[in-house]
Amino acid sequence: MPEISLRHVVSGSSQDSTHCAENLLKADTYRKWRAATAGEKTISVVLQLEKEEQIHSIDIGNDGSAFVEVLVTRSAGGGGATAIEQDYEVLLVTSSFMSPSESRSGSNPNRVRMFGPDKLVRAAAEKRWDRVKIVCSQPYSKDSPYGLSFVRFHSPPDKDEAETPSQKGTVTKLGQFRVKEEDDGASSLKPGALFFSRINKTSSASARGPAGPSYAAATLQASNATSSASSVSKALGSSCKPQESPKGKRKLDLNLEDRRPASKPSAGPPTLKRPKLTVPSRSPAAAAASTPAQKAAPGKPREGTEPRGARAGPQELGKILQGVVVVLSGFQNPFRSELRDKALELGAKYRPDWTPDSTHLICAFANTPKYSQVLGLGGRIVRKEWVLDCYRLRRRLPSRRYLMAGLGSSSEDEEDDSPGESGEDEAPKLSRKRPQAKAKTQAAGPSSPQRPPTPKETKSPSPEPQDNSDTEGEQSEGQDNGAEDSGDTEDELRRVAEQREQRQPPAPGENGEDPYAGSTDENTDNEASTEADLPIPELPDFFQGKHFFLYGEFPGDERRKLIRYVTAFNGELEDYMSERVQFVITAQEWDPIFEEALMENPSLAFVRPRWIYSCNEKQKLLPHQLYGVVPQA
């Protein structure tokens, strides 16, 4: 449809000095026409066409107007530039561009509407006109001036274009933009239009053919589709069976139509790829223990049988951190806003300051005012990686792994762990921890500061080798919980006393024997075999997931001891300062370089070597704030 060219602006009731009415004549710039001041209820502009044309369609780009009306007249009709209102005929009735709520909030001010011949008044559209009057109104908002972004008039298409249907009627190119024409059946924003459209939809849905299957029939069809998919997946391997059936049950209500044609294993590739990430990392003992549990409880597919990625899908993203109220401290924009948006997207609530209902303080570094306040109140303080990892993995992670300080009770940790996650998280931990512990004890040698494996101590573990990994996992969890909470102090003291008794060697002559009267013969084969069969005691891993960097000079062999302790307790040492470093161990006083490092990585903590030694003495993770390096006053 050819565009009708505009000659000049005849008159206008109001116009801004910058956004004047002449901007509507410029086809390529898309400059706006706005009122001179805010609060005007109605503004109008009269445009002169090049010649008398029959107007077939109108394209209007809004700029804050609530209603727009288009009238037409002829300049030769006796009115001239001062034509009276009776000379104008309505071409486009008052059309809504913004609802009252949108007008008050200022949302969607630049809506574009395209009015075809069916939207125009037929009597006026069949005649030829050379002057157009556009009337805009905004009765709902008086905060900002309003107007139009552009207006385009089109004449009827040629006969050749009308005979050959083309796509130009549905997509119109306006400069560098392609504007899709509104559907003929689209309802305009009129009072009661949404209500009547809802009634029409329900009546048309009830008047359709036979009704769809009931819920029971849909369940039966989905179970048949699941059984057929599981029968085909038997040829692919037995490892796919525990993942196939829960997916069918879980996706029944969400997407039943997509599951019906799944007679061939179309869902096979995603279910086969995800277990490859978790199955190799699980130890044989954990895998053997999970197999009978899956067979014994087929009605609970969510407890350790479903892949980790399928547990928290996109539809559950807003429920991952439900019930969590976070407070931010030490972050600067734009990262602060990004972190807050991610926490809100995960379902958490945000508070600018610490309130009684707040649960977590996400702190960039220690010694901030909020940090001291929450630490005194006994709140939980975590690093920013907790929210980032939850957002990246699409599931809720235990916050105790990211604690900076604060409470760490087991009840709160149980709330952090969603059902079915503990079994899968423990299996990779145990499989990683056993070989590392053996390698560390062998590398430490006889001069290691850890407790040596005495015969009494090596007999203390359970004699059942197949349950060794599970018992070790429970012991390590007990140590972690003991390091974080203050409960079970009597059991902890009793356990430490027993360990000290086991470490103390018998005094010479205690049994009435001469220590120098023993035989110097070599051990026999039987004795050597029994000593080789004894299990190696496991070291605690309270430094797991923490990255350290040794800065500056250390007296004597202190650097070697620090490296040995950090490695023995499953910490990671970095060769240079990087973004992964969390703790900088130094024997020096505060250095101005530390301020530059804090600007780049606010989560850094500068501690003294005494913190590592104290953790080794207590055999648990102690708060590093007591051993921090702070600037001199």
From Swiss-Prot:
Residue ranges occupied by any BRCT domain in the UniProt entry: 316-404, 538-629
Residues recorded with modification Phosphoserine: 144, 203, 230, 245, 263, 372, 409-411, 447-448, 462, 486, 519
Cross-link Glycyl lysine isopeptide (Lys-Gly) (interchain with G-Cter in SUMO1): where in chain: 180
SMART domains: BRCT
Subcellular location: Nucleus; Chromosome
Top-rank lineage group of the source organism: Eukaryota
Glycyl lysine isopeptide (Lys-Gly) (interchain with G-Cter in SUMO2) cross-link, chain position(s): 180
PTM (free text): Phosphorylation of Ser-372 causes dimer dissociation. Phosphorylation by CK2 promotes interaction with APTX and APLF. Sumoylated.
Segments of skewed composition (Low complexity): 280-298
Annotated Acidic residues bias: 411-425, 467-491
Biological process annotations from GO: base-excision repair; double-strand break repair via nonhomologous end joining; single strand break repair
Spans traversing the lipid bilayer: none
Keywords assigned: Chromosome, DNA damage, DNA repair, Isopeptide bond, Nucleus, Phosphoprotein, Repeat, Ubl conjugation
InterPro entries in UniProt: BRCT_dom, BRCT_dom_sf, BRCT_XRCC1_rpt1, Galactose-bd-like_sf, Xrcc1_N
Pfam family, one: XRCC1_N
Gene Ontology molecular-function annotations: damaged DNA binding
Residues that bear Phosphothreonine: 202, 454, 458, 489, 520, 524
Subunit structure of this chain's protein: Homodimer. Interacts with polynucleotide kinase (PNK), DNA polymerase-beta (POLB) and DNA ligase III (LIG3). Interacts with APTX and APLF. Interacts with APEX1; the interaction is induced by SIRT1 and increases with the acetylated form of APEX1. Interacts with (poly-ADP-ribosylated) PARP1.
Function: Scaffold protein involved in DNA single-strand break repair by mediating the assembly of DNA break repair protein complexes. Negatively regulates ADP-ribosyltransferase activity of PARP1 during base-excision repair in order to prevent excessive PARP1 activity. Recognizes and binds poly-ADP-ribose chains: specifically binds auto-poly-ADP-ribosylated PARP1, limiting its activity.
Name of the protein in question: DNA repair protein XRCC1
Origin species: Cricetulus griseus (Chinese hamster)
Lineage of source species: Eukaryota, Metazoa, Chordata, Craniata, Vertebrata
